Amino acid sequence: MRVRNQLLGAVCAVPLLALGAASVQAASIAKHCGPKDKYVVAFSQANYAEPYRQHVNNDLTELAKAIPQFDLQIADGAGNDNTQTSQVDNFVTQGVDLLLISPFEAAPLTPAVTRAMKAGIPVIELDRQTNGDPGKDYTAFVGGDNYKIAFEAGAYTAKTLLPDGGDVAVLEGLPSSTPAVQRLNGFKDGVKQNAKIKVVAEQAADWLPDKAQTAFSAILQAHPDVKVVYASNDMMAAGSYLAAKGAGKEGQIGIIGTDGLPGPAGGVRAVASGQWAATFTYPTGAAEALDLAKKILIDCADSVPASVIVPTLAITKINAADLDKKLKF
């Protein structure tokens, strides 16, 4: 049964691929393939609550329409490991031809991915990863370099926002997810380029705006001299802005997000309007993931890149207004 998702999203320009050096061996490629057959491509999404994930779903849905051999089915993991595990196991039982997955958390979803691989179903992990290595424990990974994206945000803070130094706070995503750990470490390493910067607070807000608002409000009370806050996604950046505004510090604190989503509630608009200092795009990887799926199922490829890394773009006051006008929502 085809699942259709009526979701708001944006169609952004697809960047060039940066392909990992390792390749998957033939044993990991689909058992059945060819251009004349129909294939069920199942996607287990971590949740539908985050705007970024809606954006991913929308991109996949729109792009899959151009591939007549594909029947794309999307399931909402609802931010619950047990729910997502059950959905993946159901896909395996149904005998889908290829599994895409953005795991809610790494460790809890690893056994389900292992079961899919043992059943002979190619698995492409999108945005987030389970434990193990792409090309070995699962077929391939498609996503941004979370560490590098956050490192660039840290470097931007060190060189542009706080060249004379100052106090900085960090709002981390869900600590048990790979992007949260990678972005936290990347930003902290990036700001080390300026020895005068001090990270005075780190707080997990689980990617959620309300938790970010509460956390940053408490941080501002404990550290009133904070000049910049790095939020690991745009939703937490939005919560940080509300906290700063509530503390009477609107316009006094540089807010940095990650995702670079378009639209009225997205990070691009927030930077263009002057509410935030910057955000860094995290492309959906939808086109790249479907391209790998085509190679595996339609082209009968005997090897595919184990990692496809999509590059980021810094959105600042220099380019935000122009991008906001160009991007569709």
Predicted features by range, described:
Residues 34-35, 41, 84, 141-167, ...:
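Hydrophobic alpha-helical segments within soluble ligand-binding/sensing domains
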Residues 27-39, 171, 175, 179, ...:
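Hinge/cleft segment of the Venus flytrap/periplasmic-binding protein
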Residues 1-38, 66, 114-121, 321:
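Short, low-complexity disordered leader/linker segments with a strong preference
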Residues 103-118, 187, 201, 205-266:
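Hydrophobic alpha-helical
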Residues 52-66, 70, 149-156, 178-197, ...:
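Short, solvent-exposed amphipathic alpha-helices that sit
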Residues 29-63, 67, 72-90, 96, ...:
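Extracytoplasmic "Venus flytrap"
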Residues 106-107, 111-148, 159, 167, ...:
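Flexible loop/hinge segments that line or gate small-molecule binding clefts
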Residues 72, 120-123, 199:
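Hydrophobic beta-strand scaffold residues
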